[in-house]
């Protein structure tokens, strides 16, 4: 794969954020690249990395033909982890998903783990290991997106994955999913740190407008979130920046070493919260001894622009409003946010009709990192008590 080389980066303490890199060629046999501004990632190394990466597919009541396309596009070497929060009654959509996955496995022999997010056996496992952050007041697992991602990471850790990547289940272009996973691998191969994140920026996000496709460069939520994330960073450095272009990158990946020390927020604030947390905790040289290895190696964040457009299910304006509110709540409640920045966020939310005068963005629920969970004990309880856990080829 040929990509623009990671020439420019901004450094905040132990955190390095690289400027957006474009994919130049997805597959190549070129060995010597004469231009220093181009990076060549050998195909063999990409495929070797794919075998160490679990791809997590969170889903909730998605169209089955979209799910089918996404699963078929994930490179065969990657174990697939499906965490579904779909209906189990009236109708039982989860059963339909299970049937689809069984058929997919019979055709492909792919390595798959599948579980329902609200499985009581999962909740029991979390209670057993003393991790109640993911549970509601009744002892059940909450229904948020972040909770599903956290479950996926634990399952990936249980099978020994070194990397975890996330892809949405509602993508209309299966070939895009195939590229996303290979882009993750390329990002990891460019890194010199065990603590690495790769975040994807879509080249275009098509919309149907007046009966034709319009290839929009930015989504509304992304524009707003990136603007305020860059303002947050600029206030800390006193230098204006536009470095962050992947604030809401649902398609992103991490090394397991980074994933297991990350706290996670719930619902749709999870992707911007990852950036805010890393800047808060590792953006200054404070309490270094707690994470000595992280500070020694540094955290590298790569942002890659895909060749493929991202065309996914339109979930409506209410979904967009919720994403904007929760994304900006992450920045608003950051300990780095100044009074001026908070005021600008409030004014923006009121202007868009998302908040009323006198209201504030909600405070986020944060789940602790998973690094203290006894993964063997957790997995043993899941296997012995789960109603929905399925393993194919693993």
Curated annotation (Swiss-Prot):
The cross-references to SUPFAM superfamilies, in alphabetical order and at most eight, read:
Nucleotide-diphospho-sugar transferases (SSF53448)
Single Gene Ontology BP term? mannosylglycerate biosynthetic process
List the EC numbers from the record: 2.4.1.217
Q: Which residues cross the membrane?
A: none
- Please indicate which superkingdom the organism of origin belongs to: Archaea
Function, in words: Transfers a mannosyl group from GDP-mannose to phosphoglycerate to form mannosyl-3-phosphoglycerate (MPG).
Q: What does the similarity note say?
A: Belongs to the glycosyltransferase 2 family.
This chain's protein is named Mannosyl-3-phosphoglycerate synthase
Q: What is the lineage of its organism?
A: Archaea, Methanobacteriati, Methanobacteriota, Thermococci, Thermococcales
- The primary gene name is mngA
């Amino acid at each position: 794969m040929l990509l623009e080389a990671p020439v420019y980066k901004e450094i905040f303490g132990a955190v390095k954020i690289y400027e957006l890199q474009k994919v130049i060629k997805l597959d190549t046999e070129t060995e010597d690249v004469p231009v220093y501004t181009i990076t060549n990632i050998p195909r063999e190394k990409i495929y070797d990395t794919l075998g160490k990466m679990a791809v997590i597919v969170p889903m909730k009541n998605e169209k089955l033909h979209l799910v089918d396309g996404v699963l078929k596009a994930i490179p065969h070497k990657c174990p697939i982890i499906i965490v579904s929060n779909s209906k189990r009654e009236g109708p039982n959509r989860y059963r339909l998903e299970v049937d689809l996955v069984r058929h997919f496995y019979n055709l492909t022999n792919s390595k798959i783990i599948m579980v329902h997010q609200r499985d009581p056996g999962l909740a029991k496992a979390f209670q057993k290991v003393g991790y109640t952050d993911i549970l509601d007041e009744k002892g059940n697992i909450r229904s948020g997106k972040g909770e599903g991602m956290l479950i996926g990471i634990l399952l990936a850790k249980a099978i020994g994955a070194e990397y975890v990547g996330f892809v949405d289940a509602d993508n209309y272009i299966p070939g895009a999913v195939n590229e996303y996973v290979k882009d993750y691998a390329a990002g990891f191969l460019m890194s010199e740190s065990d603590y690495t994140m790769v975040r994807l920026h879509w080249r275009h996000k098509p919309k149907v407008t007046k009966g034709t496709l319009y290839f929009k460069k930015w989504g509304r939520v992304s524009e707003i979130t990136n603007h305020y994330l860059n303002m947050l960073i600029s206030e800390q450095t006193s230098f204006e920046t536009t470095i962050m272009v992947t604030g809401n990158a649902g398609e992103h990946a991490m090394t397991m070493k980074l994933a297991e020390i990350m706290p996670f927020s719930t619902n749709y604030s999870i992707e911007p919260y990852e950036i805010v947390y890393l800047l808060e905790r590792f953006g200054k040289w404070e309490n270094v001894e707690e994470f000595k290895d992280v500070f020694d190696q540094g955290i590298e964040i790569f942002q890659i622009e895909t060749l493929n457009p991202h065309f996914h299910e339109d979930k409506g304006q209410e979904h967009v409003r919720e994403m904007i509110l929760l994304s900006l709540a992450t920045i608003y409640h950051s300990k780095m946010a100044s009074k001026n920045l908070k005021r600008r966020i409030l004014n923006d939310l009121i202007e868009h009709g998302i908040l009323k005068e006198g209201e504030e963005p909600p405070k986020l629920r944060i789940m602790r990192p998973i690094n203290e969970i006894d993964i063997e004990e957790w997995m043993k309880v899941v296997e012995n008590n789960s109603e929905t856990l399925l393993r194919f080829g693993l």
